[in-house]
């Protein structure tokens, strides 16, 4: 029996995509990193919004770098900059961000958290077109041949007060969030003529204390989810299902867009498998965590009451996978940075490459 022509075309395209996946790419002269995302990536951009009544930083704003990120110290991008001896790093990630406020808007003290699609990509686009008045020099030093663009978004989209609790905007589904990620990449690709992209997939959020089962260190009501209630095991398994679904979609959607659909001509992409990397730390902590205390993957360093007004920070931070109930620790971010550089060089076991 002959296959319909359209099915034959799709199968041929997917076969070509699978062949392409074995062809790793590497950037020979990695000088600049441009990042988009949420608190897993933000340095201090959210602080500007908080300190300026919700107003965004002006075009050409230089983000200060401090060791007060959501990791409890420096964020992974800082360590990539340091370890790879980069010339430039530009970080557009904002703590609290989702991919789009038209899908999963999240409220904060000044309104809605800025999102990737509605704020971060336009901010980058404006900076990319900006020239410093005093010198006429281009603000962003992002030559396409030496710049990596990364996006790591979804923790808030899939979490409480979003898809996990059915709080998304009506008639939106998880595939809409995936569409948003590629729409964001469209904007970056168009503005910068980017050649190298890294999509970082979802970590195993069902193992984070905020969403874990009780026997795996899961917690009840807390400062990130004050009204958490119900069956915590059911919550954890639903999160697991969501994360697994998203990552499987990335696995087939990315080669489709790059190889079959030719959506990004001339560009290359790696999907960095954050799920497997964090799982390896979780299940083999002695190989990764090097604090003075025993390795701890179910607990966390920074504990606060439900109001968030009283907090305690434990000692030996390098012993922990998690800084708080949701965010990886600085030690984990160091590991992420080391692996990210391997991804860029084409030598990571945690990446699939497409071009």
Question: Regions from the language model: what does each represent?
Answer:
Residues 32-36, 40-44, 88-93, 147-152, ...:
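Structural recognition of the beta-strand scaffold that forms the well-ordered cores
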Residues 60-176:
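Conserved SGNH/GDSL esterase-like catalytic core that processes O-acyl groups on lipids
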Residues 1-27:
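Fungal secretory targeting signals
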Residues 48-65, 160-174, 213-237:
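A solvent-exposed, charged loop/short amphipathic helix patch at secondary-structure junctions
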Residues 79-87, 184-198, 234-235, 241-271:
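A structural motif corresponding to the C-terminal end of an alpha-helix
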Residues 26-29, 82-86, 139-145, 149-151, ...:
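Extracellular/periplasmic catalytic domains that process cell-envelope and extracellular macromolecules
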Residues 204-237, 262-327:
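Mobile gating loops/cap/lid regions near enzyme active sites that modulate substrate access
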Residues 18-85:
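Signal-peptide-cleavage-adjacent N-terminal segments of secreted and extracellular proteins
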